[in-house]
Swiss-Prot record:
NCBIfam families: AlphKGSA_gudD. It comes from Bacillus subtilis (strain 168). NAD(+) binds at residues 180, 233-238, 336, 390. Catalyzes the NAD(P)(+)-dependent oxidation of alpha-ketoglutaric semialdehyde (alphaKGSA) to alpha-ketoglutarate. Prefers NADP(+) to NAD(+) as a cosubstrate. In vitro, can also use various aldehydes. Belongs to the aldehyde dehydrogenase family. It is an enzyme of class 1 (oxidoreductase). The active site is at residues 255, 289. Keywords: NAD, NADP, Oxidoreductase. Disruption phenotype: No effect on vanillin degradation. This is Alpha-ketoglutaric semialdehyde dehydrogenase. Homotetramer. GO terms for molecular function: 2,5-dioxovalerate dehydrogenase (NADP+) activity. Its EC number is 1.2.1.26. The keyword ATP-binding does not apply.
Amino acid sequence: MSVITEQNTYLNFINGEWVKSQSGDMVKVENPADVNDIVGYVQNSTAEDVERAVTAANEAKTAWRKLTGAERGQYLYKTADIMEQRLEEIAACATREMGKTLPEAKGETARGIAILRYYAGEGMRKTGDVIPSTDKDALMFTTRVPLGVVGVISPWNFPVAIPIWKMAPALVYGNTVVIKPATETAVTCAKIIACFEEAGLPAGVINLVTGPGSVVGQGLAEHDGVNAVTFTGSNQVGKIIGQAALARGAKYQLEMGGKNPVIVADDADLEAAAEAVITGAFRSTGQKCTATSRVIVQSGIYERFKEKLLQRTKDITIGDSLKEDVWMGPIASKNQLDNCLSYIEKGKQEGASLLIGGEKLENGKYQNGYYVQPAIFDNVTSEMTIAQEEIFGPVIALIKVDSIEEALNIANDVKFGLSASIFTENIGRMLSFIDEIDAGLVRINAESAGVELQAPFGGMKQSSSHSREQGEAAKDFFTAIKTVFVKP
């Protein structure tokens, strides 16, 4: 059976077959730019579907782990080649589902392909170290082994890159996978899984189950047949997933929220800083865990910098993300839009000054979508809600400070610690920032939202469970170490 039926319905993929869920029910996936555009219908899966997928993954894991890393890597190379042929199709689907602009979606899809090829190559790298023994006649070394079955719970904001940067290392290091994507972008995930299928992965090695997090995601976290769970999403849900995995002794990895600061020092290149702030805050309509949220500016340049941000914001074109002249698309869903608008209202209630934007767009070409104007707040203090909580929308909180020391204190004055950036020409300030900022990603003269696939990704404090994704660091989560002592 194909990934899609004639009714534009997308199926689960379990044990090498495209199948309907046990419930027989489906969930509508709509385009946030125009809710009358139905991207497709996906399965509203049940606990029985989770059971079938986990069983298939367990049955496949022994044969899969017995392949060499190089052999497993070949499947990733083939998948990457197939995805490359379908880049336009996958990117357009991601845009229709999530709302990011088509150039952004194409870039993300290209990145997903690059991630596959990167981890395909990792299958040829060493899996252990030789360690000197105190016994001169003995050999001691480490080797890495797969965990078994990995449950992947992926978010809607990066529907291509994040599922792949979880699945690719899991697979190449010898694990089998059951993925539960966010329902909002489940069609894109189905198209990606179809590429793995065409690449010839053995039945049961990769499985797709769509449906509600409370059933499918929670089911994976609680299932004794799932050896590890990797999750990206909200702090609220992440804590539930982590507690469920911990309760049964399973390995878990959580990547969650951020409240990412950019410090603009009085010696900064203001043009470069303004462009980076606008891009970091408003690209993908602010729906990135690494998006710029707080902009902390020294008082001597505050007014000049504020004007640059306002002018750049006025030039932003908002609309259907598939159109070439659009710079910022819609919010991904009604719930997300309502959440963003509630934070904007909260900012005004607490005394911040809304300088620009922040209005829901609902007339004319916007009437069928989830649109909001990008917003910039002035007169923000660190204790305000909009300076403390993740909004996940196009909202900047401007904070004025007198010194870099004050800026650093405010930057660290949140429960999150994912990404942080500073703009300065002073090497001393750069080094102090690197040393003192509480963030897993530290950016100097660059926007907060930049990530490279070959480097570790993850946060501090409540942004993460303190493991790292991507690059060689992924090996630490997706494998277990055996220490071997050999006495002839």
